[in-house]
Amino acid sequence: VLFYYAGEFTPAMIAAAADTLKGRLASEEAGSAAKRKVFSTFIEMAQNVLHYAAAHAEPGQPQPPASGAIAVGRDASEGDAGHYWLVCSNPVHVEHIARLTEKLSALRAMSLAEIKESYRTQLRNSEHADNDALSKGAGLGLLTIARDASAPLEYSFASTPDPQARTALFHVKARI
């Protein structure tokens, strides 16, 4: 494991974590393309936690900060040696599970060429904000992660101790 963090995600935390990861990647014996992809994927995953982690405040209380976990590591097994992995986990609203599953299932079925074409199409999509009210960006985060990954993204949802069952724990894994 090169990096692990669990807790509140803020812009300052992401910047500090990015600096730490950069330093650790600098000492790795990997090509610059692999390091760039790991760093880019890390930033996208951290931004996803920051922007999409479900947090519930009691009525009249301020919204709590986004929380989650992110880890970066390198495979040591002979067949996978040199490959990096990144895992991110955060709570999501249960009503978003179907939407996330649809997006991730579609990404898993795409070839790299199809992912790149979808990315280029999305870059030109000036109506994204009108068509996807839940997305806080240009809709490029998961496409960026999938584009940089060497295998289809893995994902799962798990129950949380939320007594009202409003959230689930979302996990996504990318291999670089």
Language model: regions and residue ranges:
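Short amphipathic alpha-helical segments
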Residues: 13, 17, 34-41, 137, ...
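Conserved beta-strand-loop-beta-strand hairpin that lines the nucleotide-binding pocket
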Residues: 52-176
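Phenylalanine-focused residue identity feature
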Residues: 3, 9, 39-42, 84, ...
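Conserved polar catalytic motif of the HATPase_c/GHKL fold
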Residues: 44, 48
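Helix-loop-beta hinge of the Bergerat
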Residues: 1-29, 107-120
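Amphipathic alpha-helical interaction segments
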Residues: 28, 32, 49-57
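Conserved short strand/loop->alpha-helix "switch" segment adjacent to the catalytic nucleotide/phosphoryl-transfer site
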Residues: 21-43, 127-132
